[in-house]
Regions:
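HAD-like aspartate-dependent phosphatase fold
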Residues: 1-109
Length: 109
């Protein structure tokens, strides 16, 4: 049976899975402050020896987003699970095309 997690919460399915991919923006924080219920659920996932990845499409390295989250008060143990699209792009370029030319489309960084 499908559960409506908006009503029953993620903690209702923690025992059913080993790994969770969780969107960061809007789920764990709103850009200004952390969502305490989400933080408590992440701690519960950890206590139950489960794993999670906090995904974001931020076009920056993981380290930049971790600094942003630290300023909001997120504990290091939770921040260490962040993975950004910017980090994925950097990893891909370093692995496959480090010496090749490429054209960047987007705002200057």
């Amino acid at each position: 049976m499908t559960k409506n997690l908006d009503k029953v919460g993620l903690s209702s399915i923690v025992d059913d899975y080993q790994l969770f991919y969780i969107d960061l923006w809007g789920v764990v924080h709103n850009g200004v402050s952390l969502h305490e219920k989400a933080i408590n659920t992440l701690k519960e996932i950890t206590k139950k020896d489960k794993e999670y990845v906090l995904l974001t499409n931020a076009p920056r390295p993981n380290s930049a987003v971790k600094i942003f989250l630290e300023k909001m008060g997120m504990e290091k143990e939770i921040r260490d699970h962040v993975y950004t699209s910017g980090e994925a792009a950097l990893s891909y370029l370093n692995k496959n095309h480090f010496d090749d030319k490429f054209f960047h489309i987007g705002p200057p960084r």
